Amino acid sequence: MVHPIQIGKRTRMSFSKVKEMCPMPNLIEVQLNSYDWFWKEGLNEVFDDVNPIQDYTGNLILEFIDYNLDKDAIKYSVEECKERDATYAAPLKVKVRLLNKETGEVKEQEVFMGDFPLMTQQGTFVINGAERVIVSQLVRSPGAYYGYDVDKTGKKLFSSTVIPNRGAWLEYETDSNDIIYVRIDKTRKLPISILIRALGLGSDAEIVDWFGEEERLKATIEKDNTKTREEALLEIYKRLRPGEPPTVDSALSLINSLFFDAKRYDLSRVGRYKFNKKLAIYIRLLNQVAAEDVVNPFTGEIIVQKGETIDREKALEIQNCAINAVNIQVEDKVIKVIGNNFVDIHKFIDFDISDLKIKEHVHYPTLKNILDNYTDEKSIKEEIKKNIHELIPKHIVVDDIYATISYELGLPYEIGTIDDIDHLGNRRLRSVGELLQNQFRIGLSRMERVVKERMTIQDQEVITPQALINIRPVAAAIKEFFGSSQLSQFMDQTNPLSELTHKRRLSALGPGGLSRERAGFEVRDVHHSHYGRMCPIETPEGPNIGLINSLACYAKVNEYGFIETPYRLVDKKEARVTDEIVYLTADEEDHYLVAQAKEPLDENGCFIDEKITVRDLEDVIVVSKDQVDLMDVSPSQIVSVATAMIPFLENDDASRALMGSNMQRQAVPLLKPAAPIVGTGIEYKAAVDSGVLPKAEHDGVIEYVSSTEVRIRRDSDGGLDKHKLLKYKRSNQGTCINQRPIVSKGEKVKAGDVLADGPSTDFGEIALGQNIRMGFITWEGYNYEDAMLVSEQLVRDDIFTSIHIEEYESEARDTKLGPEEITRDIPNVGEDALKNIDERGIVRIGAEVRSGDILVGKVTPKGETELTAEERLLRAIFGEKAREVRDTSLRVPHGEAGIIVDVKVFTRENGDELPPGVNELVRCYIAQKRKISVGDKMAGRHGNKGVISRILPEEDMPFLPDGRPLQICLNPLGVPSRMNIGQVLEVHLGWAAGEMGWHIATPVFNGAFEDEIVELLQEAGYSEDGKTVLYDGRTGEPFDNRVTVGYMYILKLHHLVDDKIHARSTGPYSLVTQQPLGGKAQFGGQRFGEMEVWALEAYGAAHTLQEVLTVKSDDVVGRVKTYEAIVKGENIPEPGVPESFKVLIKELQALCLDVKVLSDTNEEIKIKESSEEDMEDLGVNIEGTEDEIVPTAEKRSSNQDEEALELVDNEEFEDIKLEYDDLQLDELENGLELEDFNDEH
């Protein structure tokens, strides 16, 4: 039944039935742990890979000995980096030793290897002032994979791929004639016997002896035209290096460098682990019948007798006795099974070698060699340490290749298993640390080339490590990764949940991953191995569906990059669930039967029911209670954090739950956050781990609290901890980040307690929206198509008001004609426009600005023109002041307004780092309060989204019997077809809880049942169906039917109408077509497209159509003349020829086609090449520079075009600002606008 639980400072009444056994791990540990690993181990591995660098003679040797990150030399703190557009980084220093073999001279130096970006405590990076997140990548794990195709006759043709981390692939395939082929590194296929011969088994007899007499192998040997090792080597060389003269030596060295050279072929630790797991002999021996006695080579005992079935224990014993080949009886055939000769080192060494950190199996021949030659512990340990790379080779070895071939040969006899590449046991995570390591490796290998070149060129006497090493390639590789990699993303900072989700995101895209176009349905689909590891719900809609996923709540990533999930162990003898918790990867879990977390237990933890429902791979089956191996730790372990925040998720349709999870991430932080009445209990954990809340570092007592700072007196040593709070900072998405304290002076706090609320949090719980009193009722059609009818009270009381902060910057540069200047002295600007500008020329903080207001006054030198006599006189009298400058001030863009909350000025004089050519940089921050308005998008947590259609006066809204009006009316038709019934249960529970003053926690799959809600409704004094009589606010009459009413948690999403609506009369035009640009950012127009033209044609509205396609679009002369005619009140003149038509003619002429335009009477119509002359006469400049009006042509002889000059009466232009070609190219992102390129935009 319902019971109280304490979450932070708030008590919630919880409906959970299952007590949580396992605490949720830190939700951003994926990021933090991976980055830590990089500094502790990852970087070391890279240096080990390149050590030592030798010159071509082998005389000079360069070694990297040690490295350290100088955290004391960090230039700016995180906050300063954001302010100054800097990167939060620390210098990496590497100790380098140079050895000259001839002279025996050794030089050691510490070399600076560039600034390395540091991760903040929140798991983000600050790159060039912007917070970025490195998303983890899901990739195929290196290993050996087996599959099959079916040919026309229904016969299974087995194939296999051996995939390294980097290096040449080996692919085996069988054709319908039972011949096995191999492809080496994607080249043409060869019979597999050629590869076997080349690896050392030259003759047919040797091959058959080694692999056993197998039909397909014999057929392959017959097909093979080589008979010796030498012939095979030459054959392979011809295939891999066509056109080069083949020799046996070059063929040998080619194979060695392709497969057995650690620099060219890298399996990585994961690959070695997967190889040993797949190719180990014991897995294939399970449940097979031995064809002969298997004898322990050390003791001579018989492990398995002929004809005996091999069980798990016997199979393991065979493996641990280093027996690498066993004959198996399959019906009437004898099949030889060969392993890859790797063993568990602890079975052969009886003393402690834990300090060597050997977790993988080791290569037995190498180990045997050491054990045969040494006997005492110390020297064995030394040798193992020395030969660690031979014991655990990072490249493939001949034994591995033989084992992969043996596996392929055994598959038709059901020895071995087929792999599923979408199984999470075969997909792993590359997190920040590994991605960084790969980048660093690329940089270092480029640097290695430079070092080798310099070694040969420079004088060997005076050479130093510093002179050899060029850090450019390393620094460039790292910079490129953080700046432009697909996996380095601009952090989604809309609210704390979106931050958290972004850090826990898993992407299958990116370098070395899949591409959207190639990814099929299987990769995207939910797989049974996702259970407890990846969320089956949260993924984007659209082309990325299933390729971008989210980590489940309890999931962890192990050292190999596989995702693990926790389970409780079951004691099978007593059928008792213990409190012991194990973390399992997907392929380990496959061997067990797992019960669900809600399975009822008695007080001793034993199963109550005799029959238990369990998961077995993708099936759900019922077994007796003594067969269960494991039990889930929590019902919410299968979903991600965002999905776990949806109450009654179990009553929602999956596709709507997906929308609900995604839309919570788009909720805008509101002015007064309110935690949900009906929550799930995970809100606190999510907010605390997201990193937006300041937490106490130590136990202590609050000594001082203000709106900007909290100070804590530590209990341990009496010292003082100071926590600065963020005030009105702009997030990446333009929402407002503001923290306010929730502790008071004298309060005792424990380490980890929340000190202040941030954006969208309420008492340390995530609070994305508001609890709104609503009813499912239609109202005058304003609910059509999911629209929402809202009460004016939401506007008046600022319930859905949010603060948005925009940043505008202006820089004063050096131009060819002189430096730009930031000043208050702007030409042709009245004093009225400068009322908020200070003496420096910058707007004052606190000023209210509207669109078009000046933020930063700036003037740019103009080209010197021929001066008239009067001007020369003025120059002579007043000096330089009368020089030509142009007003290029920063103004508030169209449709923006607000209050200046901050201004930052960076100058060269103050020692700020500015880009080259920039002397001064000014940034203004404008904050605006956005109240809820018609057209804003709102949503619940169950995927029920809609747009506000009307804001109704409070007195007209439907009201309850006690007189309280509803705040929102939703359409009841939105529920049944969408099957998200969770929202109805939320409304009922919220109605009861709201009345009783409770906050509720109803965890997913573990929450309130229908009868519990009914009980609570009765307790609160409401009808048990949750419905009530509603009265019409306009007439006071009751509605015909009773209506479901209650409290629903509603979010305001980031799709605000203010950001989307805009209006244009005239504005910038595209340079080529002279048509208006498109989109709000370019201040564009509405495109009158193909279909709209058809519509006007269908109506026969010829003149309207002509006008739309000419003077309203790209008839340059006609545009101006029409404007004139409107201004002077005359009739609109005839349209001219559209510019796009001229462009079309030019394009046809570019194809060498002679195009003429003919009239009805077949006479050629001359189309003027350029309308520049007309334009100049009209006083319009079509080049699209910033000067809107060209001065009327005074330099011409007066008789030339008298009437053209008469057209333009200068005085009339004083008050009309023509904006035809206001196209300031430098202000558009890429110069020409997007329509000019056939891009995907």
UniProtKB/Swiss-Prot annotation:
Q: Which reaction does it catalyse?
A: RNA(n) + a ribonucleoside 5'-triphosphate = RNA(n+1) + diphosphate
Where is the sequence biased in composition, kind Acidic residues? 1200-1210
Indicate yes or no for the key word Signal.
no
Picking any one GO biological process from the record gives:
DNA-templated transcription
Key words, A-Z: DNA-directed RNA polymerase, Nucleotidyltransferase, Transcription, Transferase
Spell out the residue ranges making up region: Disordered.
Answer: 1186-1210
InterPro entries the UniProt entry points to: DNA-dir_RNA_pol_bsu_ext_1_sf, DNA-dir_RNA_pol_bsu_external_1, DNA-dir_RNA_pol_su2, DNA-dir_RNAP_su2_dom, DNA-dir_RNAP_su2_hyb_sf, RNA_pol_bsu_bac, RNA_pol_bsu_CS, RNA_pol_bsu_protrusion
Assembly with partners or alone:
The RNAP catalytic core consists of 2 alpha, 1 beta, 1 beta' and 1 omega subunit. When a sigma factor is associated with the core the holoenzyme is formed, which can initiate transcription.
What's this protein's function? DNA-dependent RNA polymerase catalyzes the transcription of DNA into RNA using the four ribonucleoside triphosphates as substrates.
Q: What is this protein called?
A: DNA-directed RNA polymerase subunit beta
Source organism per entry reads: Clostridium novyi (strain NT)
